[in-house]
């Protein structure tokens, strides 16, 4: 077994897709040391043959730490190396047996959550893979083995505390809350009303605490309609909640009906409240059999119900699986378009974007308050509210604003990250797993392609978020809700992903960004305008990867750096000449008009 002494830490430690050569998707490295994070220790290592789908068998050694699997090749110049955070691993299987015949038929198959698979062949000796298999399984699935996530062992230090990015009260004040129509309630401060909601909620001013409790009894998981966003001018609101507990008998709840009417009355602009049910109509009807359902317009006469036809988590999971099958390891050029169409992935992206556009347009142009829900209000609901808010509010299109949006609409409102991603859990076939958050980020990327100057962050920012959605290096996406995060003391014991991003902000900044206040974005959601996100889904294929870095973006960055250098030198020149200017203006023999004003052309 390898020793656990730690080499000197490199802040640019290899992880996922760092330090690639320009020409392919494999990392090439000459350094003999394995870079490790503070708190990362080496567990074991083993000679293997990496069955590379692009270059064939590569002899080398894999190193397993408490955070990542690291492969370092031999016999090639330059060396092929890559690292996979253990949290990215979905499944580890043994390949072949002691009696297997054929070259490289004995080893390990590793399925990853980030669109790639790995295969390692080992020497066909007695128990030659036993130790490496057990160590990999133990540290890749810590919850299944009674261990802590690496985030709790991570000793990285950052200049800024990313946990301070989002403060609910600060965000409420930014939106002009509370006001004469809306109040902040502390009814959930101990998670007593709803254990998957945040402690602070915004509700209509005229709704009492008792009203909220009675409404909670009629909403799935007690997830009552609460405010997500308030339009600064027309005071239309985006509300989020779960489905009503109507059931097969078509139950009614006068408190819930009155509560939704109060929401309608808060803006006074329209006579109707629009309820967006993210589900297909048939699914919403089927939910009545399990006690759920939807708002009957007879019971809610001042509301309009619209179904958005977005499919459930199981359909999305199968769609991503089909997409992975066609993009890794090889792309079949002759049937590419038909194969992509058969996955229905872009169709699902279209439906999510279309739904969010409807929500945003109803609020901005229709000046109507809206209520958004799906079944439990933590999957499709989060997609719709956060995308609509991104379209409506330019603040969320900044780096910090987007972090606030994710913390608020996804993390604090109980999107089940642990269940959907399967953090630390070996049960790869769990039916709760689904790429809901990935779909959201994909939709954001689609918007950034259509509005290249509207977002302060770049593509690398979005990919970094997705990489650490799986990595378990940070506490940001761990667990299903704030109740559990508070219990596990995540904020106190783990670093935040936003700390990393704030420490290297220039890496994640879009050089084409132009700040525009009060601009509403309406992306085109037709199939002709949507693209497969090649730089994410096919980034592991060296033959498909697009040129990195983008030459236009690279040149623009160089020009910006040149401009900044000119501005700096100009400021230094002005400072150094300042005493001379002051003396000349007080001297009768040196009129001030003889000294020209120094200005920058930028």
Swiss-Prot record:
<dbReference type="GO" id="GO:0016020">
    <property type="term" value="C:membrane"/>
</dbReference>
<dbReference type="InterPro" id="IPR003595">
    <property type="entry name" value="Tyr_Pase_cat"/>
</dbReference>
<feature type="binding site">
    <location>
        <position position="312"/>
    </location>
    <ligand>
        <name>a 1,2-diacyl-sn-glycero-3-phospho-(1D-myo-inositol-3,5-bisphosphate)</name>
    </ligand>
</feature>
<keyword id="KW-0904">Protein phosphatase</keyword>
<feature type="binding site">
    <location>
        <position position="377"/>
    </location>
    <ligand>
        <name>a 1,2-diacyl-sn-glycero-3-phospho-(1D-myo-inositol-3-phosphate)</name>
    </ligand>
</feature>
<feature type="binding site">
    <location>
        <position position="287"/>
    </location>
    <ligand>
        <name>a 1,2-diacyl-sn-glycero-3-phospho-(1D-myo-inositol-3,5-bisphosphate)</name>
    </ligand>
</feature>
<keyword id="KW-0966">Cell projection</keyword>
<keyword id="KW-0443">Lipid metabolism</keyword>
<feature type="binding site">
    <location>
        <position position="313"/>
    </location>
    <ligand>
        <name>a 1,2-diacyl-sn-glycero-3-phospho-(1D-myo-inositol-3-phosphate)</name>
    </ligand>
</feature>
<feature type="binding site">
    <location>
        <position position="416"/>
    </location>
    <ligand>
        <name>a 1,2-diacyl-sn-glycero-3-phospho-(1D-myo-inositol-3,5-bisphosphate)</name>
    </ligand>
</feature>
<feature type="compositionally biased region" description="Basic and acidic residues">
    <location>
        <begin position="17"/>
        <end position="33"/>
    </location>
</feature>
<feature type="binding site">
    <location>
        <position position="376"/>
    </location>
    <ligand>
        <name>a 1,2-diacyl-sn-glycero-3-phospho-(1D-myo-inositol-3-phosphate)</name>
    </ligand>
</feature>
<dbReference type="InterPro" id="IPR029021">
    <property type="entry name" value="Prot-tyrosine_phosphatase-like"/>
</dbReference>
<protein>
    <recommendedName>
        <fullName>Myotubularin</fullName>
        <ecNumber>3.1.3.95</ecNumber>
    </recommendedName>
</protein>
<dbReference type="GO" id="GO:0048311">
    <property type="term" value="P:mitochondrion distribution"/>
</dbReference>
<dbReference type="GO" id="GO:0004721">
    <property type="term" value="F:phosphoprotein phosphatase activity"/>
</dbReference>
<dbReference type="GO" id="GO:1902902">
    <property type="term" value="P:negative regulation of autophagosome assembly"/>
</dbReference>
<feature type="binding site">
    <location>
        <position position="380"/>
    </location>
    <ligand>
        <name>a 1,2-diacyl-sn-glycero-3-phospho-(1D-myo-inositol-3-phosphate)</name>
    </ligand>
</feature>
<dbReference type="GO" id="GO:0030017">
    <property type="term" value="C:sarcomere"/>
</dbReference>
<feature type="region of interest" description="Disordered">
    <location>
        <begin position="1"/>
        <end position="33"/>
    </location>
</feature>
<feature type="compositionally biased region" description="Polar residues">
    <location>
        <begin position="1"/>
        <end position="16"/>
    </location>
</feature>
<dbReference type="InterPro" id="IPR016130">
    <property type="entry name" value="Tyr_Pase_AS"/>
</dbReference>
<feature type="domain" description="Myotubularin phosphatase">
    <location>
        <begin position="162"/>
        <end position="537"/>
    </location>
</feature>
<comment type="similarity">
    <text>Belongs to the protein-tyrosine phosphatase family. Non-receptor class myotubularin subfamily.</text>
</comment>
<dbReference type="InterPro" id="IPR000387">
    <property type="entry name" value="Tyr_Pase_dom"/>
</dbReference>
<feature type="binding site">
    <location>
        <position position="287"/>
    </location>
    <ligand>
        <name>a 1,2-diacyl-sn-glycero-3-phospho-(1D-myo-inositol-3-phosphate)</name>
    </ligand>
</feature>
<dbReference type="GO" id="GO:0005737">
    <property type="term" value="C:cytoplasm"/>
</dbReference>
<feature type="binding site">
    <location>
        <position position="313"/>
    </location>
    <ligand>
        <name>a 1,2-diacyl-sn-glycero-3-phospho-(1D-myo-inositol-3,5-bisphosphate)</name>
    </ligand>
</feature>
<feature type="domain" description="GRAM">
    <location>
        <begin position="28"/>
        <end position="96"/>
    </location>
</feature>
<feature type="region of interest" description="Disordered">
    <location>
        <begin position="577"/>
        <end position="602"/>
    </location>
</feature>
<dbReference type="InterPro" id="IPR004182">
    <property type="entry name" value="GRAM"/>
</dbReference>
<feature type="binding site">
    <location>
        <position position="420"/>
    </location>
    <ligand>
        <name>a 1,2-diacyl-sn-glycero-3-phospho-(1D-myo-inositol-3,5-bisphosphate)</name>
    </ligand>
</feature>
<feature type="binding site">
    <location>
        <position position="376"/>
    </location>
    <ligand>
        <name>a 1,2-diacyl-sn-glycero-3-phospho-(1D-myo-inositol-3,5-bisphosphate)</name>
    </ligand>
</feature>
<keyword id="KW-0963">Cytoplasm</keyword>
<feature type="binding site">
    <location>
        <position position="420"/>
    </location>
    <ligand>
        <name>a 1,2-diacyl-sn-glycero-3-phospho-(1D-myo-inositol-3-phosphate)</name>
    </ligand>
</feature>
<dbReference type="Pfam" id="PF02893">
    <property type="entry name" value="GRAM"/>
</dbReference>
<dbReference type="GO" id="GO:0046856">
    <property type="term" value="P:phosphatidylinositol dephosphorylation"/>
</dbReference>
<dbReference type="GO" id="GO:0005770">
    <property type="term" value="C:late endosome"/>
</dbReference>
<dbReference type="InterPro" id="IPR010569">
    <property type="entry name" value="Myotubularin-like_Pase_dom"/>
</dbReference>
<dbReference type="GO" id="GO:0046716">
    <property type="term" value="P:muscle cell cellular homeostasis"/>
</dbReference>
<feature type="active site" description="Phosphocysteine intermediate">
    <location>
        <position position="374"/>
    </location>
</feature>
<dbReference type="GO" id="GO:0005886">
    <property type="term" value="C:plasma membrane"/>
</dbReference>
């Amino acid at each position: 077994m390898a020793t656990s002494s730690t080499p000197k830490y490199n802040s640019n430690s290899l992880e996922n897709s760092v330090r690639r050569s320009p020409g392919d998707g494999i990392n090439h490295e000459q350094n003999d040391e394995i870079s490790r994070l503070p708190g990362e220790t080496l567990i074991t290592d083993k000679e293997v043959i990496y069955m590379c789908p692009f270059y064939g068998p590569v002899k080398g050694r894999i190193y397993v730490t408490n955070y990542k699997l690291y492969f370092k090749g031999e016999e090639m110049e330059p060396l092929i190396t890559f690292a996979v955070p253990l949290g990215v691993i979905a499944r580890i299987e043994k390949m072949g047996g002691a009696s297997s015949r054929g070259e490289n038929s004995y080893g390990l198959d590793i399925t990853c959550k980030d669109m790639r698979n790995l295969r390692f062949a080992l020497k066909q000796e007695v128990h030659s893979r036993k130790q490496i298999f057990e160590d990999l399984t133990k540290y890749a699935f810590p919850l299944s083995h009674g261990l802590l996530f690496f985030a709790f062992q991570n000793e990285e230090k950052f200049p800024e505390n990313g946990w301070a990015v989002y403060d609910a009260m600060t965000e409420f004040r930014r939106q002009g809350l509370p006001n004469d129509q809306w109040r902040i309630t502390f009814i959930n401060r101990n998670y007593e009303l709803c254990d998957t909601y945040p402690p602070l909620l915004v509700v209509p001013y005229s709704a009492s605490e008792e009203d909220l409790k009675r409404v909670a009894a009629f909403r799935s998981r007690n997830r009552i309609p609460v405010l997500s966003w308030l339009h600064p001018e027309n005071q239309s609101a985006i509300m989020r909640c779960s489905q009503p507990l109507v059931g097969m008998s078509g139950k009614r709840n006068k408190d819930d009906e009155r509560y939704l009417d109060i929401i309608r009355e808060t803006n006074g602009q329209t006579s109707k409240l629009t309820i967006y049910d993210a589900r297909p109509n048939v699914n919403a009807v089927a939910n009545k059999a399990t006690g759920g359902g939807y708002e009957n317009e007879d019971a809610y006469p001042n509301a309009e119900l619209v179904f958005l036809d977005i499919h459930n988590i199981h359909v999305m999971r199968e769609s991503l699986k089909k997409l992975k099958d066609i993009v890794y390891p090889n792309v079949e050029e002759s049937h590419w378009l038909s194969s992509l169409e058969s996955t229905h992935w872009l169709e699902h992206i279209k439906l999510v974007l279309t739904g969010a556009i409807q929500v945003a347009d109803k609020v901005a142009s229709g000046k109507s308050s809206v209520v958004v829900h799906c079944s439990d209000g933590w999957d499709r609901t989060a997609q719709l509210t956060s995308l609509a808010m991104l379209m409506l509010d330019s603040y969320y299109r900044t780096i910090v604003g987007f972090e606030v949006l994710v913390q608020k609409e996804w993390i604090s409102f109980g999107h089940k990250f642990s269940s959907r991603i399967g953090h630390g859990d070996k049960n790869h076939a769990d039916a709760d797993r689904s790429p809901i958050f990935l779909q959201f980020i994909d939709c954001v990327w689609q918007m950034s392609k259509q509005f290249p100057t509207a977002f302060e962050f770049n593509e690398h920012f979005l990919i970094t978020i997705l990489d650490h959605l799986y990595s378990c290096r940070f506490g940001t996406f761990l667990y299903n809700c704030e109740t559990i995060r508070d219990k596990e003391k995540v904020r106190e014991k783990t670093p935040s992903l936003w700390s990393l991003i704030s420490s290297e902000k220039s890496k994640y900044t879009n050089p084409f960004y132009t700040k525009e206040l009060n601009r509403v974005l309406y992306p085109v959601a037709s199939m002709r305008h949507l693209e497969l996100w090649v730089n994410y889904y096919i980034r592991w294929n060296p033959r498909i990867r697009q040129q990195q870095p983008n030459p236009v973006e690279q040149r623009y960055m160089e020009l910006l750096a040149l401009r900044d250098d000119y501005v700096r030198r100009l400021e230094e020149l002005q400072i150094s000449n300042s005493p001379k200017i002051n003396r000349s203006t007080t001297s009768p023999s040196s009129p001030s008009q003889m000294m020209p004003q120094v200005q920058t052309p930028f």
